[in-house]
Design a protein with these regions (language model features):
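A non-transmembrane, solvent-exposed segment enriched in polar/low-complexity residues
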Residues: 7-153
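Sec-dependent bacterial lipoprotein signal peptides
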Residues: 1-7
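Alpha-helical protein-protein interaction scaffolds
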Residues: 174, 179-183
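A general alpha-helix detector
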Residues: 150, 165, 181-182
Length: 183
């Protein structure tokens, strides 16, 4: 007789291991989501009850943008959905409940590093555009059409520079899967 026995092993399934901590979160539900046919679909659900750390193992066919949605039970606003670029390996997400998006530190993904670099530079274009909008609004309020027209032209130029930067950044990082998300 041949006797086969199986051991109880804690094997992790999948090629992506996600760990994290949301400081200050005592109770809530996290959903790891992906876009399927223009809709966010949950691929894992994590219940938080007393301990703010979490862990998930997923199987990715290729690197892609995923979203960590925090259901606080009170609101369903945009500041509850944290995007991150996932790729096989280990990714760590550290943030806080009070400043869920702005405190987020995501490590373990080269594509995420490139995406963060792009977002940092892109923020400068957005900030410049907001300043120009404010100046243009004041010029219109003061009935200074010449200044308003000049500021409108500067806004157009800033928008073109923003698009050119995004295209150039994507081309310079074309070997990474994040490039199409930028361009």
């Amino acid at each position: 007789l041949l006797l086969l026995s199986a051991c109880n092993q804690n094997e992790t399934k999948g090629n992506l291991h996600i760990t994290g901590n949301i400081k200050g979160l005592k109770k809530g539900t996290l959903y790891i989501q992906r876009v399927v046919d223009t809709t966010l679909v949950a691929i894992d659900t994590i219940h938080i009850d007393g301990i703010s750390t979490f862990e998930s193992n997923l199987d990715l066919k290729s690197p892609e943008m995923l979203y960590l949605f925090l259901d606080r039970g009170v609101s369903n606003s945009l500041d509850n959905n944290l995007s991150f670029f996932a790729e096989p390996g280990t990714i760590t997400i550290e943030t806080s409940l009070d400043r869920y998006l702005s405190d987020a530190k995501i490590t373990g993904s080269k594509n995420q590093e490139i995406f963060e670099e792009y977002k940092k530079i892109n923020t400068r274009f957005t900030d410049e555009n907001l300043t120009l909008i404010e100046k243009r609004f004041n010029a219109i309020k003061n009935k200074d059409t010449k200044a308003a027209d000049s500021l409108s032209a500067k806004q157009d130029s800033n928008t073109k520079r923003k698009y050119l930067f995004a295209t150039n950044f994507a081309l310079n990082n074309r070997d990474f899967e994040v490039a199409p998300y930028i361009a």
